[in-house]
């Protein structure tokens, strides 16, 4: 399966039991910041934004004082899982980032999608990739 198919079929799909509800944008990005696949709606990001995210995975709490920035949007960092998941909130939407062995799985959402639904979609694919050694 291509990386784009993972984004299209596993991240940008309808949320289970909620037809028509889906993430706003999603991507799979290598830990070096290279885009493996992304939705057409995924924001253009700066290398330093991805560097900040990677630093937070290695040094949990790094982004808390400044917020998580992606594509020029600032998210307030909320509870995640140190070294494994970063979660951010902005208004009625937010972001979930799951770290795998080689990549980051990113999902961005707005209402009516809930934070829990975004977490489920992103983390499920991330866990699958981890199981595959990716």
Curated annotation (Swiss-Prot):
* SMART domains reported for this sequence: PROF
Question: Motif Involved in PIP2 interaction: where?
Answer: 84-100
Q: Which PROSITE patterns match?
A: PROFILIN
Molecular function as annotated in GO? actin monomer binding
| Cellular compartments per GO CC | cell cortex; cytoskeleton
Report the subcellular localization. Cytoplasm, Cytoskeleton
**Keyword Phosphoprotein set for record:** yes
Q: What does this protein do?
A: Binds to actin and affects the structure of the cytoskeleton. At high concentrations, profilin prevents the polymerization of actin, whereas it enhances it at low concentrations.
Which family does the UniProt entry place this protein in?
Belongs to the profilin family.
Q: What is this protein called?
A: Profilin-2
| Organism this protein belongs to | Olea europaea
